[in-house]
Amino acid sequence: MDHKQLKEFPNDFLWGSASAAYQVEGAWQEDGKGASVWDDFVRIPGKTFKATNGDVAVDHYHRFKEDVALMKEQGLKTYRFSIAWTRIFPEGRGEVNQAGLDFYLALIDELIKAGIEPMVTLYHWDLPRALQEEYGGWESRKIIEDFTNYAAVLFEAFRGKVHYWVSLNEQNIFTSLGYLLAAHPPGVTDPKRMYEVNHIANLANASVINKFHEMKIPGKIGPSFAYSPNYPINSDPKNILAAENAEDLMAHYWLDVYLWGEYPIAAMNLSLIHISEPTRPRLI
């Protein structure tokens, strides 16, 4: 196979890897950590392979120094990791759990010492159980204030140490799998609720980014997105239109809001089918 190098990567390109708190940390009930919706969801029979869970995972909480040493050995330039909301606020709000905050400060310092740029994800799907039980989590606009306050604590605590932030990790995944396919918490199959949850997540994302700029945090912030392109199978105009509509429904439904603050027309037309008349003014 012939490989052609079209352009060299710049020297400051951030080669790295990423994880999520629930995927790697373990220590699910240690040092004051509260329960998340994933702690409950994995205990529902049939929801995970062989009833596996993240109670221990790879024990990153206790072995992060070894893990960072391995990252350095690999030559990573950056490491993106998420914060477990329930380590900072065990009930989703209230008093800060200092032990949880100290863990992430120690991890960040270890990364910096190893010459690895820390990149922080504020939310990677592990919503505090308390907020889900109190007001339905992402189904209530109350979460906007709670998420923003949580983010502000992290912005201030990591100021000057973390320069790259991800507000929401793959919003299209946690809204679709949580509220359309029931493969993620809270295990719902309801298009109407999915569209409403997604809109509230958009508002929360914007609120957190605005807070970041209001606090004059040095760095960059934005959401991440799980993008899968859609191509027409041939040049038939009907198939080209179908591919364009699929792009609207599966990608631009999120990306257009992030970039332009508007939903694409095709996606709005579909979502309005599933949204009852009294609800519509709140969503457009």
What is each of the regions a protein language model found here?
Residues 80, 87, 277-279:
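Short, cationic motifs built from Arg/Lys/His that form the positively charged side of catalytic pockets
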Residues 35-69:
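Aromatic- and Gly/Pro-rich amphipathic surface segment
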Residues 12-14, 61, 78:
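A common structural microfeature
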Residues 2-48, 91-93, 101-276, 280:
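Active-site region of glycoside hydrolase catalytic domains
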Residues 83-96:
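Glycine-rich, proline-tolerant flexible connector loops at the mouths of alpha/beta enzymes
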Residues 55-56, 95-96, 197:
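A generic structural signal for short
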Residues 63-84:
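Catalytic domains of carbohydrate-active enzymes, especially glycoside hydrolases
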